[in-house]
């Protein structure tokens, strides 16, 4: 496939007029407009046969000046279209993956809720089975199959969190950090769990837990009432990720900077942030980018099962949720309960309503999550040898085409 006449988002984080060549599910060339003819000639010369040469040119897309960016990667969301990852159902995961691909999210790492340990183990085992089945299906995938986002990990938001900052999590299932249980989670998921959230102030053994687990899984600060000092200690011990910055954590003030201040001070910490226009004021989004380098910010959707669905009553982690417009809240007390916005819309909102440069926003939804997940060598940028997951956006950032695995 040749994708021509597009503004290619390069690995250096800028847009350059040119094109992309894919073969199979892999990007094989990226060219500027000036080097177009030379690149195409070279590709034809290196093709092994006339059949390959014909395949190279039989599918040419005229991008008509569209932006060409990598497929988005959402490493923290719960569900969409009436389904939730924690339903523990492979067909639900498949439907979620199909919806995500349709909106431009080509790789997913869904999040768990705070549920009983045995139930979480079952959910993780189901996810591991789904992943293995997908690997077999991909070998016989045809052009008529629906596109699916690749399942690249799991983000465990609980159960080692704070009851004070539980948000829309069920307090009855919160437990202190426990290495044996954490290992059970990793084993049940066949090590698909990439992030394990904790509230360090809730466990006397938090620092030792982090030190003993950090080489097996990314430890994140999640739903935590930690002070600046406690959060700083956890990050210095090896925690390297912060779950939805500003939300479900200590407030950020000039005398008590809390988790936000600790994350800002630690150059190794990556922070998730929800840019749906509901969870955080635009001014605080801009402030976060000024406090931390853009390379450490990760856009997430935190979407729940009502995403893509009409207003009404739904559930999240066993709790009743009311959805009105773009806001999801617990029926019990009005607490925000995830979002009803997909990652593509969050990225667009960050640019059009919050003043984040497009080049920065794209990195926060592609490159940065890929780095955090440890998959940047295979996806997250438009680079030779990487997965051919590419989105075409018009000048209004409206999605025009999803190219998944080169098709």
Regions found by a protein language model. Give the residues of each.
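Active-site core of metal-dependent hydrolases
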Residues: 187-309
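Active-site gating loops and adjacent loop-to-helix segments of metal-dependent hydrolytic enzymes
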Residues: 98-109, 163-190, 233-235, 239-245, ...
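Alpha-helical scaffold segments that flank or form the walls of functional sites
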Residues: 67, 75, 85-150, 172-189, ...
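His/Asp/Glu-enriched, well-ordered alpha-helical/loop segment
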Residues: 261-271, 289-301, 307-393
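Divalent metal-dependent hydrolysis catalytic cores, especially in the metallo-beta-lactamase
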Residues: 78, 94-126, 148-162, 189-203, ...
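Active-site loop-to-helix "anion-binding N-cap" substructures in soluble metabolic enzymes
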Residues: 79-88, 109-119, 248-265
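N-terminal metal-binding scaffold of metallo-dependent hydrolase/deaminase domains
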Residues: 1-39, 45, 49-50, 403
């Amino acid at each position: 496939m040749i994708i021509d006449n597009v503004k290619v988002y390069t690995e250096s984080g800028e847009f350059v007029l040119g094109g992309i060549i894919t073969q199979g599910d892999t990007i094989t060339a990226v060219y500027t407009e000036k080097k177009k003819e030379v690149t195409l000639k070279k590709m034809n010369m290196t093709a092994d046969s006339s059949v390959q040469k014909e395949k190279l040119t039989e599918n040419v897309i005229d991008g008509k000046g569209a932006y060409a960016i990598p497929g988005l990667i959402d490493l923290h969301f719960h569900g969409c279209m009436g389904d939730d990852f924690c339903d523990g159902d492979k067909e639900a995961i498949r439907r979620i993956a199909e919806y995500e691909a349709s909106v431009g999210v080509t790789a997913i790492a869904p999040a768990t809720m705070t549920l009983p340990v045995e139930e979480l183990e079952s959910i993780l085992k189901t996810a591991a089975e789904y992943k293995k089945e997908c690997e077999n299906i991909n070998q016989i995938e045809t052009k008529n199959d629906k596109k699916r986002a690749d399942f690249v990990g799991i983000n465990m938001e609980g159960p080692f969190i704070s009851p004070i900052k539980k948000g829309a999590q069920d307090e009855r299932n919160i437990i202190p950090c426990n290495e044996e249980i954490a290992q059970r989670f990793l084993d049940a998921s066949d090590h698909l769990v990439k992030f394990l959230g904790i509230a360090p102030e809730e466990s006397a053994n938090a620092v030792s837990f982090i030190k003993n687990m950090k080489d097996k899984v990314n430890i994140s600060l999640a739903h935590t009432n930690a002070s600046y000092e406690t959060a700083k200690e956890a990050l210095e011990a090896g925690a390297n990720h912060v779950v939805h910055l500003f939300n479900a954590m200590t407030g950020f003030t000039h005398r008590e900077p809390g988790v936000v201040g600790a994350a800002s001070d630690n150059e190794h910490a990556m922070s998730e942030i929800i840019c749906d226009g509901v969870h955080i004021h635009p001014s605080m989004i801009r402030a976060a980018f000024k406090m931390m380098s853009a390379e450490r910010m990760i856009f997430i959707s935190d979407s729940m099962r009502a995403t893509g669905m009409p207003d009404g009553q739904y559930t999240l982690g066993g709790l009743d949720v009311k959805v009105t417009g773009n806001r999801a809240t617990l029926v019990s007390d009005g607490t925000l309960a995830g979002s009803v916005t997909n990652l593509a819309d969050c990225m667009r909102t960050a640019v059009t309503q919050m003043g984040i440069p497009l080049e920065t926003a794209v990195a926060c939804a592609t490159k940065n999550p890929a780095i955090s997940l440890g998959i940047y060598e295979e996806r997250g940028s438009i680079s030779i040898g990487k997965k051919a997951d590419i989105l075409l956006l018009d000048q209004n950032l409206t999605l025009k085409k999803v190219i998944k695995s080169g098709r």
